[in-house]
Amino acid sequence: TDATADYYTAIKMGDVDLSLTAGGTSFELDGTLSIDTFDRNGVASPTGATPGERLDWSTAFDFDSDGTADTFDPGAELPTPQDLTIDFTDSLQYRLSGSVTGDGNDLDGNPGTVFLNAGDVSFAGSAEFALSRWTVDATHSSGVLTDTTLDSYAFSLNDVTLEVDSVATFSVTGAVGFAKVTPTDATADYYTAIKMGDVD
């Protein structure tokens, strides 16, 4: 009822066919995306101020007032019901899966077919993907980093160029997982990890 309070939005898509052209600010991917699934947990302020935490949709509602959280499934109201249960925790920002064909620049700024630039790592070509972004606390040797951004990527690759700056450039076919942790302090170190499975 407070017109100045934050408001909360959620989107859930399952088994959809959606195409869009992405820039580097769209899920950190550059190129043409074909989306199969998409979940988003949003919070915004009507006053333009910095919003607070996102909603934990898995515990937010008690429709029958019995003291137990109830699930919220807008898809249950469709003429042909679909399971679109919105049960996102407040740590989720978004997650999606599909395929991408890159058209971005490489690490040196040269035009190419890069679909992901993340720190000192880039991927070029086309791939199937699953990615997500979360707000989490991360523990490292010096303590706990609070409210970091965790970006998670998984790719199914076919002859994709993987470049690790100042290390090597690879041509990769197979499965690759990549993660990046970014602290709230823009001057602090960020952390990356790559795992390859069944690659050529």
List the predicted regions and their residue ranges.
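N-terminal low-complexity, acidic/Ser/Thr/Gly/Pro-rich segments
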Residues: 1-200
